[in-house]
């Protein structure tokens, strides 16, 4: 096994003494920093490389923290309108996971970069910490690399805002197999339209 494989096996046992101590120290370190900052190198190089990171110019790592827990509905003075069924304010759960939210916040802040992927690094009682892999689409080292220059195309701008990253896809219900029949046609909305629309076929 290579060195990265050993690191990968280490992270599979997060309750081990080694990793509990390491994550505890790292959480303390991340709490002292701003909520979004650039990391000099990935904290988990094995995971970053599996998700597309390369230690070359044009690839950047941003570390971000997201507050854990559900989402409170932003209602002015508690005025909720409509039926009592939709009066909830506190116990609402967001559709997207916190990793997707973290990617979105990095993507909005770093508008000129492309978000490639992200991964979990640590968490404590209040926050979850993620590292987001970003790519500079205008860097020659990226544009000349045939394995990654697909991300330079304009169609891949803000992938994270459209649910095209791995974390974003998880809440869209997109996949293959018998459990993903509700999104046949591209999305839940496309599947619903196809099933609920009246089709008047012209037979010739």
Swiss-Prot record:
This is Large ribosomal subunit protein eL15. GO terms for molecular function: RNA binding; structural constituent of ribosome. Pfam families: Ribosomal_L15e. GO terms for cellular component: cytosolic large ribosomal subunit. Keywords: Ribonucleoprotein, Ribosomal protein. GO terms for biological process: cytoplasmic translation. The gene is RpL15. It comes from the Eukaryota. Belongs to the eukaryotic ribosomal protein eL15 family.
């Amino acid at each position: 096994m290579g060195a990265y494989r050993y690191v990968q096996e280490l992270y599979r046992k997060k309750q081990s003494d080694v990793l509990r101590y390491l994550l505890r120290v790292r959480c303390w370190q991340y709490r002292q920093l701003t909520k979004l900052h650039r990391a000099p190198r990935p904290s988990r190089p094995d995971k970053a490389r599996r998700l597309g990171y390369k230690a070359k110019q044009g690839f950047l790592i941003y570390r971000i923290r997201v507050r854990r827990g559900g989402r409170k509905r932003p209602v002015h003075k508690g005025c909720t309108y409509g039926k009592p069924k939709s009066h909830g304010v506190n116990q609402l759960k967001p559709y997207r996971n916190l990793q997707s939210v973290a990617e979105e916040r990095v993507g909005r802040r770093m508008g000129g970069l492309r978000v490639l992927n992200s991964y979990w690094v640590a968490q404590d009682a209040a926050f979850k910490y993620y590292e987001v892999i970003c790519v500079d689409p205008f860097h020659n080292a990226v544009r000349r690399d045939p394995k990654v220059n697909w991300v330079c195309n304009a169609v891949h701008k803000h992938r994270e805002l459209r649910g095209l990253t791995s974390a974003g896809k998880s809440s869209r219900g997109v996949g293959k197999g018998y459990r993903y029949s509700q999104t046949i046609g591209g999305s839940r909305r496309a599947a619903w339209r196809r099933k609920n629309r009246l089709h008047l076929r012209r037979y010739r």
